[in-house]
UniProtKB/Swiss-Prot annotation:
Identification of the protein by name: Serine--tRNA ligase
Organism: Prochlorococcus marinus subsp. pastoris (strain CCMP1986 / NIES-2087 / MED4)
Source organism phylogeny: Bacteria, Bacillati, Cyanobacteriota, Cyanophyceae, Synechococcales
Gene name of the record: serS
Transferase found in the keyword field: no
Cellular compartment(s): Cytoplasm
A single cellular component GO annotation: cytoplasm
Length: 424
């Protein structure tokens, strides 16, 4: 959530920066509500001050026996009127706060001044490439490899649920489990505390991380409860410290969580209908940081490097990309994407987004720390470390052999228990 004071005092700056996302945001109504709320705060403070003075006068007059009952009742009536007026203003403020919350929650984060300017993904800037992309002819797509090796079944999954669900079978399930354990071990050994959060989250948690209200159509909601299937572990990890003041001495807090993720993919009709790339349910290992506001720029580089380390250990070719202002996620100020090489399509596909959200999520979730004896909002960062299904797809395609088998990356062999997945 953006700072009300910034919107109120520097609206042009806010509008100009939001426009870099490629959309016009009118903040006049928000500024009007914010100014009105500030005026009410001033009125309340003034009335409370007058009421306090009056109480002192009444007390002094009673102690000195300088007041009769009629005068005393008149003063008490005046005090009651002050309290009634304060109560009325408090109710107005409550209504204004709700309106402000609703309006401000629709505004995305301000892009970082360091994010490249651009309208869409075509304007993203490649930072670097790593590894040697496989470019042979007649390479199979991962779904063909998976079907040939009996690693998953999408037909039966459609009977169980509907399209865009998949059941991993045999070595497919085994490979998924191996990847999860491998990623969790790598990150845990790198200073992350492992959490296993709930898969169901409430609306307040989704609001806090920035998924609501904008992405309500992209999520699955329970019919009879204020609960949603979590679209990413970023949601419960943000909410883990909701409404807390964190001791600066223990920062940064670094968490890693494996979780199922659920997305409706409402806007992806006709795209990636086969395989593991775009499913309604998928598994992901998520990295999440709570850090000192002065340290988030360095933390962003570090969390990205931590996600990259998985790709390097698995020897999967990838590139890193600096996301332009028009392609940034709602809560992000700056994002570095990691894209893994998929030989069958001769292109890179996103496998991790590592984002610095500054204090945007912390404001929405009321997560603060103490800096120079003052309470300040903390900074949050998140990144996939990695998406399991897409990692599996990359291993199948980059590790495919002429005999139809798949070579397992050396670092994964102790977890998988074999160097190859072979036809039976």
């Amino acid at each position: 959530m953006l700072d009300q004071k910034l919107i109120r005092e520097n609206p042009t700056f806010v509008e100009d920066n939001l426009s870099l996302r490629g959309k016009v945001y009118d903040i006049a109504r928000i500024r009007e509500l914010s100014l009105e709320r500030k005026e009410i705060d001033t009125e309340i403070s003034s009335l409370q001050s007058e009421s306090k003075k009056l109480s002192k006068i009444i007390g002094q007059e009673i102690r000195n026996s300088n007041i009769n009952s009629k005068e005393l009742n008149e003063l008490k009536d005046k005090g009651n009127k002050y309290r009634i007026k304060v109560s009325e203003f408090e109710e107005q403020k409550r209504i204004l706060d709700k309106q402000l919350q609703d309006e401000i929650s629709k505004l995305p984060n301000l892009p970082s001044k360091d994010a490249p300017l651009g309208e869409n993904e075509n304007n993203n800037i490649q930072i670097k490439e790593w590894g040697d992309p496989l470019t042979k002819d007649n390479l199979k797509a991962h779904w063909e490899i998976g079907e040939n090796l009996n690693l998953f079944d999408s037909v039966k999954s459609t009977k169980i649920s509907k399209s865009r669900f998949i059941t991993l079978t045999g070595n497919g399930a085994r490979l998924e489990r191996a990847l999860v354990n491998f990623m969790l071990d790598v990150h845990s050994n790198n200073g992350y505390l492992e959490l296993m959060p709930p898969a169901l989250v409430n609306s307040e948690s989704l609001q806090g991380s920035g998924q609501l209200p904008k992405f309500s159509n992209e999520s699955f909601k329970c019919a009879n409860d204020d609960l949603w299937l979590s679209p990413t572990a970023e949601v419960p990890l943000t909410a883990f410290h909701k409404n807390e003041i964190i001791d600066p001495k223990i920062l940064p807090l670094k968490y890693v969580a494996y979780s199922p993720c659920f997305r409706r993919e409402a806007g992806s009709y006709g795209r990636d209908t086969k395989g593991l790339i775009r499913l309604h349910q998928f598994n992901k290992v998520e990295l999440y940081w709570f850090c000192h506001p002065n340290k988030s720029l360095e933390a962003h580089k570090e969390i990205t490097a931590d996600a990259e380390s998985i790709l390097k250990k698995l020897n999967l070719p990838y590139r890193s990309v600096d996301i332009c202002t028009g392609d940034l996620g709602f809560s992000s100020s700056r994002t570095f994407d990691l894209e893994v090489w998929l030989p069958s399509s001769q292109c890179y596909r996103e496998i991790s987004s590592c984002s610095n959200c500054l204090d945007f999520q912390a404001r929405r979730s009321s997560i603060r720390t103490k800096i120079d004896k003052k309470t300040s909002y903390i900074h949050t960062l998140n990144g996939s470390g990695l998406a399991i299904g897409r990692t599996m797809a990359a291993i199948l395609e980059n590790g495919q052999q002429l005999d139809g088998s798949v070579k397992i990356p050396d670092a994964l062999v102790p977890y998988f228990g074999s160097s190859f997945i072979k036809t039976t």
